[in-house]
Amino acid sequence: MGHMVNAIAQIDEFVNLGANSIETDVSFDSSANPEYTYHGVPCDCRRWCKKWEYFNNFLKALRKATTPGDSKYHEKLVLVVFDLKTGSLYDNQASDAGKKLAKSLLQNYWNNGNNGGRAYIVLSIPNLAHYKLIAGFKEALTSEGHPELMDKVGYDFSGNDDIGDVANAYKEAGVTGHVWQSDGITNCLLRGLDRVRKAVANRDSSNGYVNKVYYWTVDKRQSTRDALDAGVDGIMTNYPDVIADVLNESAYKAKFRIASYDDNPWETFKN
């Protein structure tokens, strides 16, 4: 999972390095419209924090990269995580942000339901209090006549909150599937795997809410091995080639592989 892919040129760059998924930051204006693909300062060590595009322009380029037959098509790119920077919004704007985000995606990515981009989408929300963004998103797609597109949409609360609190937020949001649980910290700092293991245990329990667990931001071979040993489903990185190298090591290549479009990202993998 390629981290902080905010310029159109970076889509090709990260997929060519081995990423089958990218993460893109989405900033909002004061009226809760998705405005830019932009992270800003501070960001990960050894990365330029200020690359950006207008959100709708990025979506159009992403559509080309994920539409079979297009000259820019990458068969390998199957999942996009939108890191929604909702910290600039009031809590009562969350539903509006979801509606406006859905309409932008419908028009510019899904091409109004007519042979749009095929990648699966994860809406990653940093604040549990913004759970109404999910209902707003679903409501907009339904009112625009495309509720079937929700089959392509999953969810993540990215604030490293207590697993029980995250479960309650999903209950409030009415979400019962398509859940990716993230855990992590900037590559400038160290973070243990305790919460990852709790998320994995939730995923593997009979009554958990988690379908997939991913860990960020992992740039070193040893931390990649540690995350794989903990049982994660995905690893977000600034260096997709490092992850690909580790997956080819004898200890891992029989147990893990890069997911393809035929793999269901909402289905919990049972080994």
UniProtKB/Swiss-Prot annotation:
Q: Which domain of life is it from?
A: Eukaryota
Chief place where the protein resides: secreted
Please give the tissue specificity annotation from the record for this chain. Answer: Expressed by the venom gland.
* Catalytic activities: an N-(acyl)-sphingosylphosphocholine = an N-(acyl)-sphingosyl-1,3-cyclic phosphate + choline; an N-(acyl)-sphingosylphosphoethanolamine = an N-(acyl)-sphingosyl-1,3-cyclic phosphate + ethanolamine; a 1-acyl-sn-glycero-3-phosphocholine = a 1-acyl-sn-glycero-2,3-cyclic phosphate + choline; a 1-acyl-sn-glycero-3-phosphoethanolamine = a 1-acyl-sn-glycero-2,3-cyclic phosphate + ethanolamine
Relate the protein's function as given in its record: Dermonecrotic toxins cleave the phosphodiester linkage between the phosphate and headgroup of certain phospholipids (sphingolipid and lysolipid substrates), forming an alcohol (often choline) and a cyclic phosphate. This toxin acts on sphingomyelin (SM). It may also act on ceramide phosphoethanolamine (CPE), lysophosphatidylcholine (LPC) and lysophosphatidylethanolamine (LPE), but not on lysophosphatidylserine (LPS), and lysophosphatidylglycerol (LPG). It acts by transphosphatidylation, releasing exclusively cyclic phosphate products as second products.
The note describing how and how many cofactors are bound reads: Binds 1 Mg(2+) ion per subunit.
The record's comment on protein family reads:
Belongs to the arthropod phospholipase D family. Class II subfamily.
Could you name the Gene Ontology cellular component terms for this entry?
extracellular region
* Protein's UniProt name: Dermonecrotic toxin LarSicTox-alphaIB1c
Gene Ontology biological-process annotations: killing of cells of another organism; lipid catabolic process
Keywords, ordered alphabetically: Cytolysis, Dermonecrotic toxin, Disulfide bond, Glycoprotein, Hemolysis, Lipid degradation, Lipid metabolism, Lyase, Magnesium, Metal-binding, Secreted, Toxin
Asked whether the UniProt record includes Glycoprotein among its keywords, one would answer yes
Which cysteines bridge via disulfide bonds? C43-C49, C45-C188
Please give the Gene Ontology molecular function terms for this protein: lyase activity; metal ion binding; phosphoric diester hydrolase activity; toxin activity
- EC class: lyase
Q: Which cofactor does it need?
A: Mg(2+)
Its localization reads: Secreted
List of residues binding Mg(2+): E23, D25, D83
The major lineage groups are:
Eukaryota, Metazoa, Ecdysozoa, Arthropoda, Chelicerata
Q: Which residues form the active site?
A: H3, H39
Q: What EC number(s) are associated with this protein in UniProt?
A: 4.6.1.-
Glycosylated sites: N248
